[in-house]
């Protein structure tokens, strides 16, 4: 069979006379001539080829011998191979530390510059330090950074400087790829640890920049998102190297030079958790949900109530109920003696959470009581006076508004509005303020009695009742944020929030479809609409039928919207019509039928798929998402800005009065000579404490970096799978062993026989 397929080939090898002796002896149709059209003219000498080959194969002794014999300068150390790689680049790709150190010792600093022929390189504009950072090789980067290397600072995507404009005009792809290479280098954990005094802060900033770049340069979105994820994981892994609570306290309380510093808190050695707040601001969910960080947060959260976690469930419930019932007494005790032992217990975040929750439940109880004590005799009063319960509600609302104002003052407008809990609170309080303001206006302006059906549609009392009803709905919905503390209900609450965001995206598509079909149906049925006064209507627009719904834009919108829930029964294709209305009725039926297919079948199922995807995404990372959301809630109770709940927070406390008197006395004394000296001493003490904290932070950070490197090496060595790093390390060891044996025996292997004679 093989002989039949290849008649010119003798499988037995006995005869080869049937083979063609040369292409010229065969027919042109049987032989295809091959020619290398990619041939690159090589300008390297034999010694330069040998030099590059020795660097590629890891032949330390041959590279050393060539460099020692290059006293006359015949060898061009800057030579490159056909791929545009010089000796340093080849060595870094092979991760050969010995040869790299040898090249640097022999003055190859010029090779640290950019490759001269990037057209033949797999990565454009790659300097050796960039290549080493891409490979995340700590040892090679350590050697290269001793040569005073530098990297070009990447410009913003929308930068319109002369340099960026010229590069974009010349080659936009090359410019974008160059920016990606630079950021891939900057995101290297090894480079961050070597060049940054605060690696965690740098990882936060880089992840935020990369996330922003992924939204702008959508062509490289996956690459930038992967780099951002790499930075987040690096910050998390670095924090995981902490061994005790003292190190965690130093890391999480560190304040960078750009952040505002609480001088009083620094002198009193209070926990500000600045780094943790910064992690939440940069949306570092991996960092915040890390086990060490969560353990430290639990310790701070319970404070002097640490024994609560070890109590049985029944005792936990009794503790919460006792605090919830006697919260007014506890608030008064803290108001009178905030620095006492009892006051310190109330000041713990856990106790503040229970007391604030009990205060809010009391507010909801007053709202329910408001509807029960409604006076039926004042039902038709156009301007009723405020009741006692109204004044109680106003006290609570003023307290909640004051709490929001303090939080807005200390956090800033941007950070305040980022929290959906604050947004809901702002809207709720605004509605309550508008409600009681309208009630006061109605009481002062209207004193008559009349049936409600005779009132103006926008009467202040009616508007106030509508706003009050909507505010009540938001008040109860605000309880959803308390679910965050539960490990069971918390993930569900987070999933609901994500689903609402996806539903907002879906509305953008649904409203366009609804508007399109509404315009079509309104245009179709509006022209022949018969007013209701004419009872002798016939055909499609007869009021005995329901087709007159489509005579207005609003009516059509309502009808099509309720079609989704099968609550609109509009007979479009009717049986009783005149001959002239047959086409019009058929077109209406087609439009509504198409609407049912597009919205009821397609878009509704799309919404279900989107919501399922959102829920599954949260469920896959349930632990991380819940711990991050819980940490955000806990942090709002860690400071001492809002210890007392409404309405006790509107009462000036002795602590506030003492702070005001102390600040006033310091301001007065600062204008005297003695006060100026005291102020200088205080500033000096503050600077010394800040310097001491920075030194402690650097010591702890050095320990974390060394532990991180050790864990990475151990992880690489203990892995059971054959990774690229393991194979490269094995290749280097075998190459070193081969070269040492060859040098000891005094000869070269056959691979180098074409370059060296044997000794």
From Swiss-Prot:
Q: What protein name applies here?
A: Short transient receptor potential channel 1
Q: How does it assemble?
A: Homotetramer and heterotetramer with TRPC4 and/or TRPC5. Interacts with TRPC4 and TRPC5. Interacts with ITPR3. Interacts with MX1 and RNF24. Interacts with FKBP4. Interacts with TRPC4AP. Interacts with PLSCR1. Interacts with PKD2L2. Forms a heterotetramer with PKD2 with a 2:2 stoichiometry; has distinct channel properties separate from PKD2 or TRPC1 homomers alone.
Task: Enumerate the UniProt keywords alphabetically.
Answer: ANK repeat, Calcium, Calcium channel, Calcium transport, Cell membrane, Ion channel, Ion transport, Membrane, Phosphoprotein, Repeat, Transmembrane, Transmembrane helix, Transport
- ANK repeats at which positions? 46-75, 83-112, 124-153
Q: Where is the composition biased (Low complexity)?
A: 15-28
* Reactions it catalyzes: Ca(2+)(in) = Ca(2+)(out)
What organism does this protein naturally occur in? Oryctolagus cuniculus
Q: Which InterPro entries does the record cross-reference, listed alphabetically?
A: Ankyrin_rpt, Ankyrin_rpt-contain_sf, Ion_trans_dom, TRP_dom, TRPC1_channel, TRPC_channel
Please indicate if the UniProt record lists Ion transport as a keyword.
Answer: yes
Q: Name one GO molecular function term.
A: store-operated calcium channel activity
Q: Which residues form the signal peptide?
A: none
- How is the protein modified post-translationally, according to the record? Activation of PRKCA induces phosphorylation of TRPC1 and subsequent Ca2+ entry into cells.
């Amino acid at each position: 069979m093989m002989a039949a397929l290849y008649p010119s080939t003798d499988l037995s090898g006995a005869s080869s006379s049937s083979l063609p002796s040369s292409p010229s002896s065969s027919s042109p149709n049987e032989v295809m001539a091959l020619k290398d059209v990619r041939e690159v003219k090589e300008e390297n000498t034999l010694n330069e080829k040998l030099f590059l080959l020795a660097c590629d194969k890891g032949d330390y002794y041959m590279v050393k011998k060539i460099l020692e014999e290059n006293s006359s300068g015949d060898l061009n150390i800057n030579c490159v191979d056909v791929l545009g790689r010089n000796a340093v680049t080849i060595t870094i790709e092979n991760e050969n530390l010995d040869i790299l150190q040898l090249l640097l010792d022999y003055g190859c600093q010029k090779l640290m510059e950019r490759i001269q022929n990037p057209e033949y390189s797999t990565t454009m504009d790659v300097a050796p330090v960039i290549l080493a950072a891409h490979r995340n090789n700590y040892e090679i980067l350590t050697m290269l950074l001793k040569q005073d290397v530098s990297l070009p600072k990447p410009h913003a995507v929308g930068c319109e400087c002369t340099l960026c404009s010229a590069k974009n005009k010349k080659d936009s792809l090359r410019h974008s790829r160059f920016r990606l290479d630079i950021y891939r280098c900057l995101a290297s954990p090894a480079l961050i640890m070597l060049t940054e005094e605060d690696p965690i802060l740098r990882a936060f900033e880089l992840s935020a920049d990369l996330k922003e770049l992924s939204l702008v340069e959508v062509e490289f979105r996956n690459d930038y998102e992967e780099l951002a994820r790499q930075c987040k994981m690096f910050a998390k892994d670095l924090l995981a190297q902490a061994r005790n609570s003292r190190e965690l306290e130093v890391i999480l309380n560190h304040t960078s030079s750009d952040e505002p510093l609480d001088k009083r808190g620094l002198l009193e050695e209070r926990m500000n958790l600045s780094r943790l707040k910064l992690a939440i601001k940069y949306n570092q969910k991996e960092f915040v949900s890390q086990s060490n960080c969560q353990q430290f947060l639990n310790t701070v959260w319970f404070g002097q109530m640490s024994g609560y976690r070890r109590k049985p469930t029944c005792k936990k419930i009794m503790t919460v109920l006792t605090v919830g019932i006697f919260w007014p007494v506890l608030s008064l005790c803290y108001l009178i003696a905030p620095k006492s032992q009892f006051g310190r217990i109330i000041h713990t975040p856990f106790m503040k959470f229970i007391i604030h929750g009990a205060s809010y439940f009391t507010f909801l109880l007053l709202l329910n009581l408001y509807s029960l004590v409604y006076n039926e005799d004042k039902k038709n009063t156009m301007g009723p006076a405020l009741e006692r319960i109204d004044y109680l509600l106003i006290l609570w609302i003023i307290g909640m508004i004051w709490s929001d104002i303090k939080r807005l003052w200390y956090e800033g407008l941007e950070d305040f509005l980022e929290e959906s809990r604050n947004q809901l609170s702002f809207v709720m309080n605004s509605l309550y303020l508008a409600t009681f303001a309208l009630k006061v206006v109605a009481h002062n302006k209207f004193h008559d009695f009349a049936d409600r059906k005779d009132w103006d549609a926008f009467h202040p009392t009616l508007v106030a009742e509508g706003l009050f009803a909507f505010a009540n709905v938001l008040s109860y919905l605000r309880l959803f944020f308390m679910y965050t503390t539960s490990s069971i209900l918390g993930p569900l609450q987070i999933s609901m929030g994500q689903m609402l965001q996806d539903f907002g995206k879906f509305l953008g598509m649904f409203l366009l479809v609804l508007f399109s079909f509404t315009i079509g149906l309104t245009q179709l049925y509006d022209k022949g609409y018969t007013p209701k006064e004419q009872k002798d209507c016939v055909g499609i627009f007869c009021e005995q039928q329901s087709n007159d719904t489509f005579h207005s834009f609003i009516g059509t919108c309502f009808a099509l919207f309720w079609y989704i829930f099968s609550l609109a029964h509009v007979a479009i294709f009717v049986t009783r019509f005149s001959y002239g209305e047959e086409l019009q009725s058929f077109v209406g039926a087609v439009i509504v039928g198409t609407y049912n297919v597009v919205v009821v079948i397609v878009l509704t199922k799309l919404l279900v798929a989107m919501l399922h995807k959102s829920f599954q995404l949260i469920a896959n990372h349930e632990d991380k998402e819940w711990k991050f959301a819980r940490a955000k809630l806990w942090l709002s109770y860690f400071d001492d800005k809002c210890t007392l709940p409404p309405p006790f927070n509107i009462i000036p406390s002795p602590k506030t009065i003492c702070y005001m008197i102390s600040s006033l006395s310091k301001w007065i004394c600062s204008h005297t000579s003695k006060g100026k000296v005291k102020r200088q001493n205080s500033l000096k003490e503050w600077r010394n404490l800040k310097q001491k904290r920075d030194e402690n932070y650097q010591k702890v950070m050095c320990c974390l970096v060394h532990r991180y490197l050790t864990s990475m090496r151990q992880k690489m060595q203990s892995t059971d799978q054959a990774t690229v790093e393991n194979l490269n390390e094995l290749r280097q060891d075998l190459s070193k062993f081969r070269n040492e044996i060859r040098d000891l025996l005094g000869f070269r292997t056959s691979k180098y026989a074409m370059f060296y004679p044997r000794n």
